[in-house]
A protein has these predicted regions:
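Conserved hydrophobic/aromatic beta-strand scaffold that supports enzyme active sites
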Residues: 4-6, 12, 21-23, 76-78, ...
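Active-site lining segments that contact anionic ligands and/or coordinate catalytic metals
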Residues: 71-76, 92-93, 100, 115-117, ...
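Double-stranded beta-helix
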Residues: 22-61, 137-141
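Ligand-binding loop in jelly-roll beta-barrel domains
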Residues: 10-31, 124-141
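Glycine- and acidic-residue-biased ligand/ion/polar-headgroup-sensing regions
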Residues: 81-108
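Short acidic-glycine-tyrosine-enriched beta hairpin
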Residues: 1-6, 107-125
Length: 141
């Protein structure tokens, strides 16, 4: 169905063709490429070698029965909505990606449809409710 895999910074990784993923990360303009599968983009071999976590200090991997991951930079949660779910964005923003099902999100003034593989962002200070039968990935800082 789906897996939650935490890949900490400094971990060399690749994404297989045809794979769908949600990539939650600390905001950064830096991506170091050590191989690019035949694409003609800049490589960063030396810089990559300087930041690789060779000792595996930053533990990552598949998270069985995933419900919540908290890092110093972001939090990711799996939210199962069976009828309704209410929340408040007390700081920054909330992001939801629908991984299964359909529903709607409303702040009392507007309603947005939520469909599989769609993402919605909710700004700070908004009280909102989600209605439907959905599995969501919620991300926030």
């Amino acid at each position: 169905k789906w897996d939650m895999i935490y890949i900490p910074s400094g971990t060399v990784h690749a994404i297989e063709e045809g794979l769908k993923l949600i990539e939650v990360q600390q905001s950064s303009d830096v991506t170091y490429r050590i191989y690019d599968w035949g694409r003609d983009r800049e490589m960063h071999i030396e810089k990559s070698l300087d930041v690789i976590d060779y000792d595996g200090k930053n533990k990552g991997g598949k998270i069985e029965n995933f419900k919540k991951l908290e890092t110093p930079y972001f939090t990711v949660e799996k939210i199962d909505v069976k009828d309704s779910y209410k929340d408040l964005v007390d700081k920054n923003f909330h992001s939801y990606t629908v991984i299964n099902g359909t529903g709607v999100i409303s702040d009392g003034n507007s309603v947005i449809d939520l469909n599989k593989e769609e993402t919605v962002y909710i700004k700070e200070g908004v009280n909102y409710s989600i209605k439907g039968n959905l599995e969501l990935i919620k991300s926030y800082v």
